[in-house]
Amino acid sequence: MSYDLATAERAAYAPFFGYMGAASAQIFTVLGAAYGTAKSAVGISSMGVMRPELIMKSVIPVIMAGIIGIYGLVVAMVLRGKVTSASAGYTLDKGFAHLAAGLTCGLCGLGAGYAIGIVGDAGVRGTAQQPRLFVGMILILIFSEVLGLYGMIVALILGTS
């Protein structure tokens, strides 16, 4: 029996890595979104006791945290569409590329969700005491959101090439 490199690259377990990439993109981004939502909501709840008129204005961090989960959903669906069976030509390098794409999107989303949660909590509480802090909070939230967006862009490049 001879060793054939083309057959070795089409290992039967190669699609497992592709599916793990899709799963990790969804799981980690949703964990980040959940943390960001929960942490920001705690700040909104405590701020709402003192200044209930600012509650609707302070919902922005919660919305931005929810968008992080959508990034993971988009990447997971793109990766899911690219994974085929090993007999159809799905190789290990494609599987590892899809795993890297999923981890990139997922971990960037996790970090972005943490950042949005911390900034949202502190920013909402600070805005209740000093309304001029609102613009600064929004700017920092945008920079935090962009971390997740960068992860999605890199994941889409990795997953489709």
From Swiss-Prot:
Q: Cross-referenced SUPFAM superfamilies, in alphabetical order?
A: F1F0 ATP synthase subunit C
Q: Where in the cell is it found?
A: Membrane
Q: Which UniProt keywords apply?
A: Hydrogen ion transport, Ion transport, Membrane, Transmembrane, Transmembrane helix, Transport
Topology: which residues are Cytoplasmic? 37-58, 120-137
Among Pfam families, the record links this protein to: ATP-synt_C
Is-annotated flag, keyword tRNA-binding? no
What function is annotated for this protein?
Answer: Proton-conducting pore forming subunit of the V0 complex of vacuolar(H+)-ATPase (V-ATPase), a multisubunit enzyme composed of a peripheral complex (V1) that hydrolyzes ATP and a membrane integral complex (V0) that translocates protons. V-ATPase is responsible for acidifying and maintaining the pH of intracellular compartments and in some cell types, is targeted to the plasma membrane, where it is responsible for acidifying the extracellular environment.
Name of the protein in question: V-type proton ATPase 16 kDa proteolipid subunit c
Gene from which the chain derives: 12
